[in-house]
């Protein structure tokens, strides 16, 4: 995997999906023609699928396009200009914002935090992922607003879990 792009073997695993849909009726889900714009929070069928996989409610899922980095950027941008649901003010009005960056990590994640001027706090990565003892200590700082996290599990290539302080 380079720069978040799946390798040939990963792409080959889903090649058969390109020929599954053979009739326009196959493109309708819950009355929505999926060849066109769907619901803002994502297709209901996709939300049900991922809710089952993630063990949550469909209404707790947001299904976006295939570029998760865009969703990440949009979320950070909104927090920067407007704050989050429990924020007292937009992050741009705070004295400082810190973001936990497991290293090695994904350069495009780092570019987002860098472009907003966040202090990037390096978190070492063990064979099991970020050193969670370090993360648990660092999130005690109220200036820490998030952590980049790259997961590799079935159906989820990239996911940024944002830890809101």
Regions found by a protein language model. Give the residues of each.
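Conserved N-terminal helix/loop that builds the PLP phosphate-binding region
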Residues: 2-30, 140
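Conserved core of the PLP fold type I
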Residues: 26-27, 31-165
């Amino acid at each position: 995997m380079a720069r978040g792009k799946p390798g040939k073997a990963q792409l080959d695993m889903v090649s058969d999906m390109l020929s599954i849909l053979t009739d326009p009726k196959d493109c309708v889900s819950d009355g929505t023609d999926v060849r066109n714009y769907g619901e803002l929070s994502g297709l209901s069928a996709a939300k049900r699928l991922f809710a089952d996989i993630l063990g949550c409610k469909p209404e707790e899922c947001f299904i976006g396009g295939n570029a998760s980095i865009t969703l990440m950027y949009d979320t950070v941008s909104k927090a920067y200009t407007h704050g989050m649901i429990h924020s007292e003010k937009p992050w741009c009005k705070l004295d400082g914002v810190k973001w936990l960056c497991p290293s090695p990590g994904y350069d495009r994640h780092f570019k987002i935090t860098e472009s907003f001027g966040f202090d990037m706090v390096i978190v070492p990565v063990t064979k099991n992922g970020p050193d969670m003892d370090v993360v648990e200590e660092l999130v005690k700082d109220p200036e820490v607003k998030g952590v980049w996290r790259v997961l590799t599990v079935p159906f989820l290539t990239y996911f940024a879990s944002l830890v809101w302080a």
